[in-house]
């Protein structure tokens, strides 16, 4: 059983229940919806069909964020090296071979002579040779084609776009209305961009969690404040590989993963994980290694984009990713758990989480059970990337789905029992029924003062068979009085 989570991009053109069910049973944990390519009606159809398949699949919706795109063209335009092109910021005017219009009116103000403007994910490069008021003059640097509504990147330049477009705001309200689990905000440059989304959520009393997509140099430079302001991070390597030197991507990816682990924040590695499988039934060896290396770096989750949104082999892509993940995890676990320094030496929850993980290695404990109001203890445990799963007992469906982005966490909904004893034994029964544990196995139980707000206060280790033999008549340790806030 894999412990790395899988996010699948889904198009409203292919989102029927049978298709989504196949992806779910192949290993999909989260459905991602890209608002750049789907209408509100299409988004609602994906949501409805996903919830028909399972209430346990998390839903994530993208914003467009502060991006620049070209306007429409009648047909793809062919450019040769040396062609001269004028560029204007006229979002309502179509583009031609001689004049390319872009969606940002002040584009010419923010771009300088000597800058490279990259179109269509870097497929077409134009060098700015002249700037005259609202007009830029560019020279084509490589042969290529330019179609409608293609991405525009200017590496190294700060484009003064607002954090949210009007379409973004409408889609955030749609996410609130539909009770989506995550919003993935695109092109995040600083904590201020995250807070712009959070402000709207707060105004509507929404508990949707924000995933910040790191796609440019500013996002990399400000990563620490962005992590602090976000629920989690997505390393979106497509635009990132255009905005920064491509040879730096592996180092940036590893650094961001490490920072997220230290902050106990979920992290997703995305873009071209199995790109070949859009058209082919098998991946390249390089793609297999890319997935494995992301897992060796201890990512929480991996994302499929075109592979599941429009590819010919979507189910096979998920199955392939799941197999690679499971094999890489088994290899990674031979090296022991991740050493995560305590950020607060007086934090009881951190100390007990580390002790529980160490018990899985030193005492042969086969799993950890914890109950959770918000998922924080489960995320603390996930940060260590232990060899055995964490069973998180959640009292809210939403918390269960939030944990679909946390490594090694099996989140299950369970109604609230009257005592720790009842909750623990019910969890043991469920684990046995699902085949996760046997009577001879040891299990760790991490919990606290029963009820809301008690915090994590004790760690108990029991042999499964002994618990059942006593017919559940065992006593958990006295709960420690603590001033710590609950999760």
Model-derived segments and spans:
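Non-catalytic helical/linker scaffolds that mediate oligomerization, partner binding
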Residues: 1-487
């Amino acid at each position: 059983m894999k412990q790395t989570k899988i996010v699948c991009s889904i198009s409203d053109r292919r989102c029927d229940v049978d298709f989504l069910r196949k992806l779910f049973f192949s290993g999909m944990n989260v459905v991602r919806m890209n608002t750049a390519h789907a209408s509100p009606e299409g988004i609602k159809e994906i949501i409805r069909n996903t919830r028909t398949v399972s209430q346990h699949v998390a839903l994530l919706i993208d914003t467009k964020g502060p991006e620049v795109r070209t306007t429409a063209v009648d047909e793809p335009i062919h450019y040769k090296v040396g062609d001269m092109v004028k560029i204007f910021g006229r979002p309502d005017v179509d583009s031609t071979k001689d004049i390319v219009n872009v969606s940002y009116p002040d584009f010419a103000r923010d771009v300088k002579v000597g800058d490279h403007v990259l179109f269509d994910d870097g497929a077409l490069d134009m060098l700015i040779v002249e700037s005259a008021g609202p007009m830029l003059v560019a020279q084509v640097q490589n042969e290529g084609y330019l179609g409608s509504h293609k991405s525009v990147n200017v590496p190294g330049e700060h484009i003064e776009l607002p954090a949210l477009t009007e379409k973004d705001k409408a889609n955030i309200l749609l996410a609130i209305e539909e009770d989506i689990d995550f919003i993935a905000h695109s092109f995040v440059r600083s904590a201020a961009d995250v807070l712009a989304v959070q402000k709207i959520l707060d105004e509507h009393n929404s508990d949707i969690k924000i995933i910040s997509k790191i796609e440019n140099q500013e996002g990399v430079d400000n990563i620490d404040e962005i992590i602090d302001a976000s629920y989690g991070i997505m390393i979106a390597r497509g635009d990132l590989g255009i905005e920064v030197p491509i040879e730096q991507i592996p180092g940036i990816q590893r650094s961001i993963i490490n920072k997220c682990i230290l902050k106990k924040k979920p992290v997703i590695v995305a873009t071209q994980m199995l790109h070949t499988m859009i058209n082919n039934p098998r991946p390249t060896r390089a793609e297999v290694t890319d997935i494995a290396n992301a897992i060796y770096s201890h990512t929480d989750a991996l994302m499929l984009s075109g592979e599941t949104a429009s590819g010919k082999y979507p189910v096979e892509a998920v199955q392939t990713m799941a197999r690679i993940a499971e094999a890489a995890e088994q290899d990674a676990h031979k090296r022991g758990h991740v050493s995560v320094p305590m950020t607060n030496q007086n934090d009881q929850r951190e100390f007990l989480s580390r002790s529980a993980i160490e018990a899985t290695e030193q005492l042969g404990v086969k799993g950890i059970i914890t109950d959770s109001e918000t998922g924080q203890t489960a995320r603390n445990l996930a940060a260590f990337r232990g060899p055995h799963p964490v069973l998180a007992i959640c009292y809210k469906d939403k918390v269960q789905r939030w944990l679909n982005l946390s490594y090694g966490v099996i989140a299950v909904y369970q109604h609230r029992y009257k005592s720790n004893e009842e909750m623990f034994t019910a969890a043991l029964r469920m684990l046995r029924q699902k085949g996760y544990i046997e009577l001879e196995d040891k299990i760790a139980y991490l919990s606290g003062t029963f009820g809301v707000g008690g915090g994590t206060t004790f760690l108990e280790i029991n042999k499964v068979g002994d618990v059942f033999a006593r017919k559940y008549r065992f006593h958990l340790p006295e709960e420690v009085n603590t001033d710590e806030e609950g999760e």
